[in-house]
């Protein structure tokens, strides 16, 4: 028994605390960079279709889905080998997508067609196409899977979609050029970032009414350069980290008061981000500088820059 405990202890010590990978889409190189979260080095680069942007994994992490925007396809890759298994029908110019909690349906924003396409990933067939506003991009799904959100950049709206009927039941105005959306607090709130508006709007999911709005101000940075795009919540949902685009900073927001507590300097044109497995570090994609900044979450400071491909865009964690 003692020997067994010793072996288990030695095995636990051998496993890195941050073991896992961050997968990054490089939209100008048509590649994916895979970063080891223990060594903080790129360990693999895989070829994709043209202009990869959105990226997400299946629930069991056996498949990775990639929005190959200029190939007009969502590609399905085997993450163990980097092999493209097949393409899914996606509509034209897929930007972002969200995987339904059933792990079977992808909801895809089609920028050129002003629709949201619903694809069954098993049958590889389009289930529905839902008319939304002009230039849809951001996608979110409620934790219970009953509501999907599409944001439209030109119409400046968040569109609320009933997943049971694939119909719109509400449209809410936001500031100029909404880019990203996320549900929080068990689905009670919806947050939407507006790139040109320089804000994040918070909605009550039950009523679609506005609960609050946050703006950002960085000393020495012109307001026109402060452009919120992607954001991520800490597991306890006390804080949100917000990528501010060409402002080259990430804002730390108190998710209870909607107040900005701090700004962290990162690479140039920070776009999206992903936490590692224990949420101790945050990895940001910086398009213009072609790198990923590693943020120590507890210390709220950047600790390393990792060079990847040209114009990194999306990021996703794989254990």
Please describe what each predicted stretch is.
Residues 1-5:
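Positively charged n-region of N-terminal signal peptides that target proteins for export
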Residues 6-7, 17:
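Cleavable N-terminal signal peptides
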Residues 12, 16-319:
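Predominantly soluble domains enriched in secretory-pathway, periplasmic, or organellar proteins
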């Amino acid at each position: 028994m003692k020997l067994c405990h010793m072996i288990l202890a030695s095995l636990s010590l051998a496993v890195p605390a941050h073991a896992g990978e961050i997968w990054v889409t490089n939209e100008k190189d048509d590649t994916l960079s895979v970063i080891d979260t223990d060594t903080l080095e790129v360990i693999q680069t895989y070829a994709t279709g043209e202009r990869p942007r959105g990226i997400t994994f299946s629930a069991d992490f056996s498949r990775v889905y990639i929005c190959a925007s200029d190939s007009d396809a969502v590609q399905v890759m085997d993450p163990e080998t980097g092999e493209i298994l097949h393409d899914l029908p996606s509509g034209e110019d897929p930007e972002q997508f969200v995987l339904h909690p059933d792990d079977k349906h992808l909801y895809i924003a089609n920028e050129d067609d002003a629709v949201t396409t619903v694809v069954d990933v098993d049958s590889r067939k389009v289930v529905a196409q839902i008319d939304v506003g002009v230039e849809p991009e951001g996608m979110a799904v409620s934790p219970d899977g009953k509501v999907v959100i599409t944001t439209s950049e030109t119409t400046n709206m968040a569109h609320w979609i009933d997943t049971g009927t694939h119909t719109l039941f509400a449209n809410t105005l936001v500031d100029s050029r909404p880019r990203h959306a996320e549900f929080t607090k068990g689905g009670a709130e919806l947050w939407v970032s507006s790139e040109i508006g320089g804000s994040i709007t918070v909605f009550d999911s039950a009523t679609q009414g506005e609960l609050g709005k946050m703006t950002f101000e960085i000393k020495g940075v012109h307001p026109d350069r402060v452009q919120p795009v992607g954001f991520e919540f800490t597991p306890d949902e006390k804080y949100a980290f917000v990528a501010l685009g060409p402002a080259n900073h990430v804002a730390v927001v108190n998710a209870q008061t909607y107040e900005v507590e701090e700004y962290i300097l990162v690479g140039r044109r920070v776009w999206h981000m992903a936490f590692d497995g224990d949420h101790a570090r945050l990895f940001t994609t910086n398009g213009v500088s072609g790198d990923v900044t590693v943020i120590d979450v507890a210390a709220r400071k950047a600790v390393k820059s990792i060079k990847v491909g040209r114009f990194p865009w999306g990021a996703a964690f794989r254990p």
